[in-house]
Curated annotation (Swiss-Prot):
One of its GO terms (cellular component) is chloroplast. Belongs to the intron maturase 2 family. MatK subfamily. It is found in: Plastid, Chloroplast. One of its GO terms (molecular function) is RNA binding. Its main location: plastid. This is Maturase K. Keywords: Chloroplast, mRNA processing, Plastid, RNA-binding, tRNA processing. It comes from the Eukaryota. InterPro entries: Domain_X (IPR024937), Maturase_MatK (IPR002866), Maturase_MatK_N (IPR024942). PANTHER family: MATURASE K. It holds the Pfam family MatK_N. The gene is matK. It comes from Watsonia angusta.
Amino acid sequence: MEELQGYFEKDRSRQQPFLYPLLFQEYIYALAHDRGLNRNGSIFYEPLEVFGYDSKSSLALVKRLITRIYQQHFFLSSVNDSNQNKFVGHHHTNFFYSRFYSQMISEGFTIIVEIPFSLQLVSYFKEKEIQKSHNLRSIHSIFPFLEDKLLHLNYVSDILIPHPIHMEILVQILQCWIQDVPLLHFLRFFLHEYNNWNSFFITQNKSIYLFSKETKRLFRFLYNSYVYECEFLFVFLRKHSSYLRFTSFRTFLERRYFYGKMEHLQTEHLIIVCCDXFNGTLWSFKDPFMHYARCQGKAILVSKGTHLLMKKWKYNFVNLWQYYFHFWYQSYRIHINQLSKHSFHFXGYFSSLLKNSSTVRNKMLDNSFLIDTLTTKFDTAVPVIFLIVSLSKAQFCTVSGHPISKPIWTDLSDSGIIERFGRICRNLSHYHSGSSKKQGLYRIKYILRLSCARTLAGKHKSTVRTFLQRLGSRLLEEFFTEGEQDLSLILPKAIPFPFQGSHRERIWYLDIIRINDLMNRL
C-alpha cells in the first residue's frame, strides 16, 4: 500500500493550482488566446454546438455570457431561491437561456482545467522533438496491430468499464490533480443544480452519449479523468506483474483526448492510439505476453497465458472498482473466451481467428507425400444484427430490419433528405471498409435507401415505386461509398461496378477519429 501511495504521489507531483476568480475575469480568455487554445491553436478548440441553433459559438461568446451571469448575481439568486431556479431551467420563463447558461458555464470550466494539460502536452513534444502523428489517432490503426499480434495469442477478455454511480467519485478524482478547493465546490454545485446530470450518472443505457449537447464537453472531460484513473491503476498493477519493468510513463491531454507514451526495454513497449475522446479514446497495450486495447467504454485484454492468468486479471479489475472506486462491479460482466473458438465484438467489428487447412503434394525422387498445413488469419466482419438494432433505435427500420420512413425529416428539401441518408450510408461504409465480407453491409445500404424512398414518398403523399422510378440513378449514386470508389481506383479491373465485384478487399483508413454514431446507440 505504501508503494502504491508513493507511486501516486510521484506521478501527481504536478498537481495544478487553479484560480477560481479567473472564471469570471477577462484574464482567463486572454491566457487562452495567447496560449493558442482558440481556433488557430487547434490544441483544444472544438466548435461548440449552441442549443437550438446550427451556428457555432466562440470563446468571446463564452466570456460575454459568463460575465453577464456574474453581473446579474446569477449564482446568488440560484442558491437563495430554489423555487425560481434559473439554473435548472424548469421554472424559468425562457427555457433556451437557462440551458444556454449552463452550456456557457460548463465551457468556461472546461477551458480552465484543460489549460495545464495543453501546456504539458506542448512542452513534452518540444522536449522530445517528436511530431504528432494524427494517424495514430485513427480507430482503424488498432486493427492492423491486432491483425499482426493476435495470431499467436490464446485468450481474450471482454471488459465493460463501469460508469460511476455518483458524481462525487469524479470530483474526488479531480481533487487529486487540482489544488483549488473553491473550483471543486463550484463543480459540485454545477453538477447538483444541472437538471440532466441523472441521465449521465444513473442510467440503464450504457452509452455515454446520453450527455445533453450543452454540457457534453465537460462530461467528456470528467469521464476521461475517471477512465484515466482506472488505467493508471492498471498500469501500476501491470508494472509490478512484469519481469521487464517500464522505464517511464507519461499521459497527456490534447483537446479532450488523452495521449500517452511509454518507453520500455527492448522487448516491450506501449502504443497509445487516440481518437475522439469519449467519442472514443483508444489504447493499445503491447508486450510479449499481454495486449490491452480500449475504445470508449469497452476494453479487451488478450494474452498468450493460461485461463488461470486471465481469471487473475479479471478479479484484479473487480477488486479495483470495488475497493478503490467504492461501487460494486459484477464479475460476470467480464467474459474470458478462447480466441480460436470465439469471436469478440470490439470497435464496431466482430473479430475472430479463422483457421484454413491446405494440403500440398510434395514429390522427392520416386517418393511422394502429402503435407497438411494449417494457417491462421485475423478476420473482421460487420455486425449486421447490431447495426439493424441500431437503425431501429434511430427509427430507420423495424427491429426485424423492415425499412420505415423518417417523418421527422420531411420538413427538409428532397435534396436535403437524400443527402442525409447518403451521408449516413457513406459513413457506415467508410468505417466498415475493413470487413472481409461486405454482403451484410449491402443489406444496411438497402435499408437506408428504401427508408429514404419511403420518407420522400410520405412527404409528397405518393408511393415508393413512383419515387424510385423518378429518381432512378440519382438516388443510387448518393449511396455509392467513398471506400468503394477508392477501391475501384486501386483495383479498376476487379470492380466493374461499385456494388459488385471484389467484396473481400479490406481497407483501413487512418483518418477516422470517431466511431460512427449508429454504433454508439448499442
